Amino acid sequence: MFGKGGIGNLMKQAQQMQEKMQQMQEEVAKLEVTGESGAGLVKVTINGAHNCRRVEIDPSLLVEEDKEMLEDLIAAAFNDAARRIDETQKEKMASVSSGMQLPPGFKMPF
């Protein structure tokens, strides 16, 4: 099924992939991504662990009448940043497993 040395080779590849995944997770944790809303009037920066690092609000939004709109923009900017981090994580995960020669139908445990 796996050919000469197939299972040993598969185990070696799995170990290499596990090491690459560990490195990738460390890299992603260090990433910072900024999401925006309201054409850049609100910016939220988060790290790879989805922790908010910074919120920037354009001074033009700091009036009492726009409080609800500002709250919505902050939430939208955070969601945009979270989506960007998720996309980056998926791209990095795909690059980790792309070089492996896996049997047809083999599913990775992540």
Swiss-Prot record:
Keywords per UniProt: Cytoplasm, DNA-binding
Keyword DNA-binding attached: yes
Pfam families reported in the protein's UniProt record: YbaB_DNA_bd
Disulphide connectivity of cysteines: none
Superkingdom field: Bacteria
Molecular-function GO terms, alphabetical: DNA binding
Localization per Swiss-Prot or TrEMBL: Cytoplasm, Nucleoid
GO CC annotations, alphabetized: bacterial nucleoid; cytosol
Keyword Isomerase on entry: no
Main location: cytoplasm
Function: Binds to DNA and alters its conformation. May be involved in regulation of gene expression, nucleoid organization and DNA protection.
Quaternary structure and partners: Homodimer.
Membership in a protein family: Belongs to the YbaB/EbfC family.
Protein name listed in UniProt: Nucleoid-associated protein YE3092
